[in-house]
């Protein structure tokens, strides 16, 4: 029932895009430049994982490339990302004796996505996990923690690596270094106001940019036309911080819900590409991160305890002291479960002991102290003291912990079917820690429809729009209904690189 309703909504959105295209075509023709202020081979819009990867590959293929970023600093959401990346087959995984394969990763992505994914892309993504990891290390010089391997919700086994600095900046800064080395200008405060499509050939040939744009001041900056002799590559990300647009897609995602995204995650280029005639699908599948902490704004740092310590090595319980979900289920299942608990007047908590936080301390040195200092989590000497301090019934909480400890000893969780990893130990060593849980709007699964090399499809004829490519969160049909945590970086780098290579090969 849910899927069919969403399919109807998606069809309606596409129909609206076609009508919008017809209504704006004449205006676009009238505005088409007679001359251009600047000319490049490839113009990349967006400076996150995907955009920078596309720029690097296009430049290496011989193209004259420029990257445009509307915000004052580069990186977008990528630079504040948690720095965890799926790396099936990596040394960290093998050192822990974890059995994994591209086929298992592919299955996990499809199951979480309710098989709404583009299967060819999912297969390519899974097969690219190890080569992508090696590319980031060997080509970019990214440093990952050598002995840390983690498991996000929905994955069958631990398979993500963590950047040495515990942030997506550990990758983005290396991409920016490579751009500088290759001579690729990354221009900030560049707001793309319009994408030009030749009224005769239908080819995308450039953009209208407001140079010196001051976010969020509409109309600021000097208008400049830029020609793309080969292609424009769209890597503009999602719209999680555009409340009006996200509520249009999913009315449940009101302003009451915080977002993990940077302020510039807005919808203007989603609207512009619809007007251009680009096909978009699954726009109403918008993910909320279940591990958010309500006592800080945005992504923050509290999620690191809620996910890395408690979901992977501890427990999630409600204010009655009971588990309410498999802590390693996919993000939608967990976020929905939290929303049900909150609707019924019960708070949700992430809890763990000294052993639970040990892997997080290794992955993210200093994070525990920062969370305690900011009162995002609270430390107690004993489980009983935690129960007393939070109002959770101690007898129920102790029973919940005891039951889980037995599951750890049995290496099987019959109640919630959670994966018990091979280094999990019972929860019994103080001190104890607790943090509150609340979902935050996080990722857009829908977006532009592309082929395997990032060519954007037209809504009228299902054929590629000449000169237009896309990658990253601006695209749809890769993750389907739910994106698995730690797969975003893999997606952005793999398909960003492919789009950049293909764009540079345009005649």
Predicted feature locations:
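An anion/pyrophosphate-binding glycine-rich loop and adjacent beta-alpha core
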Residues: 270-274, 279-392
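Conserved redox-cofactor binding core of oxidoreductases
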Residues: 127-223, 229, 242-244, 293-294, ...
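A conserved FAD-binding loop/helix module that cradles the flavin
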Residues: 254-261, 477-503
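N-terminal secretory signal peptides and thylakoid transit peptides that target proteins
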Residues: 1-15
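Glycine-rich loop(s) and the adjacent beta-strand/alpha-helix scaffold that form part
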Residues: 214-296, 495-498
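Glycine-rich FAD pyrophosphate-binding loop
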Residues: 61-78
């Amino acid at each position: 029932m849910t899927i069919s309703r969403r399919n109807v909504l998606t069809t309606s959105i596409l129909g609206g895009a076609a009508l919008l295209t017809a209504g704006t075509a004449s205006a676009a023709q009238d505005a088409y430049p007679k001359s251009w202020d600047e000319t490049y081979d490839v113009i990349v819009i967006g400076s996150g994982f995907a955009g920078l990867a596309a720029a690097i590959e296009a430049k290496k293929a011989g193209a004259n490339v420029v990257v445009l970023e509307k915000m004052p600093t580069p990186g977008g959401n990528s630079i504040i990302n948690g720095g965890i990346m799926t790396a099936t087959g990596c040394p960290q995984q093998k050192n822990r004796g974890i059995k994994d394969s591209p086929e298992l990763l592919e299955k996990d992505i499809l199951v979480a996505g309710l098989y709404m994914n583009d299967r060819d892309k999912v297969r390519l993504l899974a097969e690219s996990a190890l080569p992508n990891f090696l590319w980031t290390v060997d080509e970019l010089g990214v440093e990952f923690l050598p002995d840390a391997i983690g498991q996000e919700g929905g994955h069958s086994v631990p398979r993500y690596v963590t950047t040495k600095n515990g942030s997506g900046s550990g990758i983005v800064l290396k991409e920016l270094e490579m751009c500088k080395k290759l001579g690729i200008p990354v221009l900030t405060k560049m707001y793309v106001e319009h994408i030009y499509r030749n009224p005769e050939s239908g080819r995308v040939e450039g953009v209208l940019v407001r140079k010196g744009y001051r976010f969020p001041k509409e109309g600021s900056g000097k208008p400049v036309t830029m020609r793309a002799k080969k292609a424009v590559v769209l890597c503009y990300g999602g719209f999680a911080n555009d409340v009006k647009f996200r509520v249009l897609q999913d009315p449940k995602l009101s302003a009451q819900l915080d977002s993990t995204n940077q302020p510039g995650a807005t919808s203007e280029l989603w609207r512009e590409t619809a007007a251009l005639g680009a096909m978009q699908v699954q726009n109403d599948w918008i993910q909320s991160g279940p591990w958010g902490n309500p006592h800080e704004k945005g992504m923050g740092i509290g999620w690191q305890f809620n996910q890395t310590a408690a979901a992977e090595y501890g427990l999630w319980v409600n204010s009655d002291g009971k588990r309410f979900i498999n802590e390693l289920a996919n993000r939608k299942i967990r976020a929905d479960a939290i929303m049900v608990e909150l609707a019924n007047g019960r708070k949700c908590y992430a809890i763990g002991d000294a052993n639970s936080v040990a892997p997080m301390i290794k992955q993210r040195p200093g994070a525990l102290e920062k969370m305690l200092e900011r009162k995002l989590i609270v430390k107690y000497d004993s489980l009983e003291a935690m129960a007393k301090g939070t109002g959770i019934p101690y007898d129920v909480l102790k029973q919940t912990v005891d039951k889980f400890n037995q599951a750890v000893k049995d290496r099987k969780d019959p109640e919630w079917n959670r994966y018990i990893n091979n280094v999990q130990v019972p929860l019994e060593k103080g001190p104890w820690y607790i943090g509150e849980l609340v979902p935050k709007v996080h990722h857009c699964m829908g977006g532009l429809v592309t082929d395997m090399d990032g060519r954007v499809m037209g809504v009228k004829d299902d054929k590629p729009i000449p000169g237009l490519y896309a990658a990253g969160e601006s695209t749809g049909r890769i993750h389907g209904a739910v994106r698995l945590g730690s797969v975003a970086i893999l997606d952005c780098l793999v398909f960003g690189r492919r789009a950049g290579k293909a764009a540079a090969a345009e005649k």
